[in-house]
């Protein structure tokens, strides 16, 4: 498995995978197509603080993820926020997510925390994440959208 920084050549495949991801049970709400396209644009341009990664197997993109980093005062250092993680159905069960997390741990070896969101119903993903050492965050989050 090879992990690459998302670029313009990946756009069409990431859009295809994004449509599958954003319609899956990994989310608890719909995401409009214009937002999906904006996310891809931001990741490819690299100027919005969003980094896109694609997962390639035999020169085929089989998954994608977005990452952003920020300073987390609770740990006194950088937090890597994994935003979206999708592997197509044909590539699941082959350790892609585990390999990706290990790739991120190496790439961001100076980070003090790695964090992401997962819906409570995604039992298989939660089981994997716990096996890797991730723990639940005991407090909720709040938001206000200004889209």
Label the model's feature ranges:
Residues 2-16:
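A short beta-loop-alpha structural element at the N-terminal edge
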Residues 22-41:
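Conserved GNAT-fold acetyl-CoA-binding loop/helix
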Residues 42-54, 81:
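A short helix-loop-beta-strand connector motif used in the catalytic cores of GNAT acetyltransferases and
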Residues 54, 60-69:
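Conserved beta-strand in the GNAT
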Residues 77-89:
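Conserved acetyl-CoA binding element of GNAT-fold acetyltransferases
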Residues 87, 93-106, 127, 131:
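Conserved acetyl-CoA-binding loop-helix of GNAT-fold acetyltransferases
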Residues 92, 115-126, 143-147:
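Conserved beta-strand-loop-alpha-helix junction that forms the acyl-donor binding cleft
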Residues 101, 108-118:
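Conserved GNAT acetyl-CoA-binding A-motif
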